[in-house]
Amino acid sequence: NISASNVKGHNEIYNNSSCPGYTKVQMDAFRAKLAQPVAVAPVAPDGVTFSGQAHIQSKGWLEMANNTLGTVGQGLRLEAFSLVVKNNGKVQPINGSIHVQDIGNVAYNQNTNLFGTVGQAKRIEAILINVGNCVQYRAHTANIGWGPWVKSGEWAGTKEMGLQIEAIEFRVA
């Protein structure tokens, strides 16, 4: 009589293959690992949501996906974007500035959620958005990739380097 707790390695009859099997001690150790807590990624405060659209070179308007406006890996410039941030369903006021090719810094007030130019084929090079102290964002810039996360009220991207922002990602910290 062979105890199941001592069986290790056997042949599967159904498909005639070798199966390494596990001892009871190994299975108990595995179950113990499953019971341990795991690290969980930070979660946005309840009720904060992002939505918007990006106006992309040769594509037009694209919806935000995974808190990201724009495209990555396609080499296409971000020309304009709209952004709506809600906290528990209430739209949050947004203002800020963008740095636009051949124009420079352009300030925006709380009466708009549209940043940039449409129909002028001008790249956005840097952004500064004021939308509350829990919002962070970063820019994906040509020839650089993703820049560092910045807080609301700080510049993301580059100025005076002639590099286009291709995407902007948002998160709550």
Which positions does each model-derived feature cover?
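Basic/polar, cationic surfaces and motifs that engage anionic cell-wall
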Residues: 1-44
